[in-house]
């Protein structure tokens, strides 16, 4: 390791939880070298984000540093960030230490222009006059690869794609050329090609600025490909730390070995063996969906068709803006397409879209269960709500005792603890909330489940558990899945058949084995090449194609 820029020594952090305090970090000690990347890896609740918040002085209400030090070594000598407060902390934040948060959708002010958001650290630190700041903002947006930066500076967040918004956050973070950049899950919600561009950008900027990067991630493949060193956290404690190759080649901790085993990878076992052909149960025919009208119309889905056999999993794969979610919501009956048809068995989904009975046939599980669950209702109330609204699968209205019995059975079916029904969503982990969303979808015994990025935000261990759960339920209940994802390693594990989308059109479709092992289209090959490899010895090869133009909004 080079001379350390950041040294964390015996850090302990706790949060107020009702009438007691809950320990979030206990005795954490780490070092990050100058100009290096340290990946902080662990599952949800391991303390990764708490570590970042402690460094930058942004612990949420009720959080406090109980002991330990966080030494940032600057030219004038080391500064203990754990002891800073008020103006002294504000002077460091943004100027010496900057944060790239996970979700640009919530981190950018929706009523502010992109230019105003990028300019915020420059204004706070009185970098220059308004005209000089305006020029600096345009320069920064250009530096992070946004086309037509002057126009982008005038736009609002909703006018940019997810990758473009993430670039804007990076522009704000590097505005004052800080010594330390904390990247908190900066690519977990992005598709593989945009993810690669964002990580390449961070690498380039690190080289230009000489900054160190603390990369917080649950993706071991990203850590393996990008980090000089890895630190593994579990339950607020450090499991192990060391050079990337040493940690991944010879993990000292059984927990690290488990994380490595759970990480989905294209190099893992072969895709599912193709089944003998059968008549499709779900049929999507020449689907078209347009947003807006007239000259402002945007065709998000253009002549898409595919079929799904009963009891199988069909994956829809593509970048942001490829039309995946639009198709999934149409199959679930949430909106009518502009043209084309959708059938489930003998039922016309488009014609039956407003029929409540369609909800018995097809259910949707979304990416963010926290947003889809009522925060004021208990888990049992949320799971039981579809039964209360629609009745039992045979149409009967259930009395309170039978409803409670079915909810308890649903909770057990998705392997949640028996007392989970009495909890609120905020009292559950991310993986537990996703299990609640699955139980809620399955309690009325649908034939088809649309899973829209249902595991993309979960750490590898929880992701593996949810995928195993979905496979078990499919085998027990004969479910048919439409699985929407940007993660090709997950597709390899769970899908029987695959359709690859690009800008609303089908690029290719076939069995998982055909598409993943023998892709016919350059775009599919480029998507496969962009997947971070968990093999830390692999040198990424160039596919010779840029899968899409730079994120176009």
Task: Kindly give the residue locations of the regions a language model identified.
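ABC ATPase "signature
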Residues: 238-242, 250, 506-510
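Helix-to-loop junction immediately C-terminal to a conserved catalytic motif
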Residues: 56, 60, 332
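ABC ATPase C-loop
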Residues: 168, 174-175, 442
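Conserved ABC ATPase signature
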Residues: 155-160, 164, 424-428, 432
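ABC ATPase NBD coupling module
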Residues: 77-98, 124, 246-251, 294-298, ...
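Conserved signature/switch motifs of ABC ATPase nucleotide-binding domains
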Residues: 94, 158, 176, 444
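Conserved ABC transporter NBD signature motif
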Residues: 65-79, 340-348, 358
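Conserved ABC ATPase "signature" region
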Residues: 132-151, 401-419
């Amino acid at each position: 390791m080079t001379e350390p820029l950041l040294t964390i020594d015996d850090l302990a952090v706790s949060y107020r939880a009702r009438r007691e305090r809950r320990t979030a970090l206990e005795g954490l000690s780490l070092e990050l070298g100058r100009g290096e990347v340290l990946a902080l890896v662990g599952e949800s609740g391991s303390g990764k984000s708490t570590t970042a918040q402690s460094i930058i002085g942004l612990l949420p209400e009720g959080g406090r540093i109980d002991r330990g030090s966080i030494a940032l070594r600057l030219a004038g000598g080391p500064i203990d960030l754990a002891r800073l407060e008020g103006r002294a902390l504000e002077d460091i934040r943004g100027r010496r230490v900057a944060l790239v948060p996970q979700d640009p959708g919530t981190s950018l002010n929706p009523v502010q222009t992109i230019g105003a958001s990028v300019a915020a650290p420059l204004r706070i630190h009185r970098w220059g006059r308004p005209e000089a700041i305006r020029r600096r903002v345009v320069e920064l947006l250009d530096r992070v690869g946004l086309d037509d930066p002057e126009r982008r500076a005038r736009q609002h967040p909703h006018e940019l794609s997810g990758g473009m918004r993430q670039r804007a956050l990076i522009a704000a973070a590097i505005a004052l050329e800080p010594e330390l950049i904390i990247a908190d899950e900066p690519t977990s919600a992005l598709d593989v090609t945009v993810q690669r561009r964002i990580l390449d950008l961070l690498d380039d900027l690190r080289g230009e600025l000489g900054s160190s990067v603390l990369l917080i991630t649950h993706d071991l493949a990203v850590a393996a490909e990008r980090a000089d060193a890895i630190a593994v956290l579990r339950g607020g404690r450090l499991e192990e730390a060391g050079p990337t190759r040493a940690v991944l080649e010879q993990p000292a901790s059984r927990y690290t070995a488990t994380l490595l085993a759970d990480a989905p990878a294209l190099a893992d076992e072969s895709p599912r063996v193709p089944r003998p052909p059968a008549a499709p149960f779900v049929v999507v025919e020449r689907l078209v969906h347009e947003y807006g009208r007239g000259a402002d119309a945007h065709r998000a889905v253009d002549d898409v068709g595919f079929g799904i056999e009963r009891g199988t999993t069909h994956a829809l794969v593509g970048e942001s803006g490829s039309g995946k979610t639009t198709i999934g919501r149409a199959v679930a009956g949430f909106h009518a397409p502009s043209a084309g048809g959708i059938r489930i068995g003998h039922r016309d989904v488009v014609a039956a879209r407003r029929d409540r009975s369609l909800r018995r046939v097809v259910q949707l599980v979304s990416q963010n269960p926290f947003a889809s669950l009522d925060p004021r209702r208990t888990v049992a109330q949320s799971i039981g709500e579809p039964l209360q609204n629609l009745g039992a699968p045979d149409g009967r209205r259930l009395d309170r005792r039978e409803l409670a019995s079915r909810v308890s059975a649903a909770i057990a079916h998705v392997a949640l603890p028996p007392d989970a029904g009495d909890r609120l969503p905020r009292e559950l982990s991310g993986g537990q909330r996703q299990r609640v969303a699955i139980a809620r979808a399955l309690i009325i015994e649908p034939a088809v489940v649309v899973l829209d990025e249902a595991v993309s935000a979960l750490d590898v261990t929880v992701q593996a558990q949810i995928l195993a759960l979905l496979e078990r339920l499919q085998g027990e209940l004969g479910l048919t899945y439409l699985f929407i994802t940007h993660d090709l390693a997950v597709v390899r594990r769970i899908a029987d058949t695959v359709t690859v989308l690009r800008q609303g059109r089908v690029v290719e479709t076939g069995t998982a084995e055909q598409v993943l092992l023998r892709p016919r289209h350059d775009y599919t090959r480029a998507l496969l090449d962009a997947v971070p490899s968990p093999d830390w010895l692999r040198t990424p090869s160039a596919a010779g194609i840029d899968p899409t133009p730079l994120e176009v909004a």
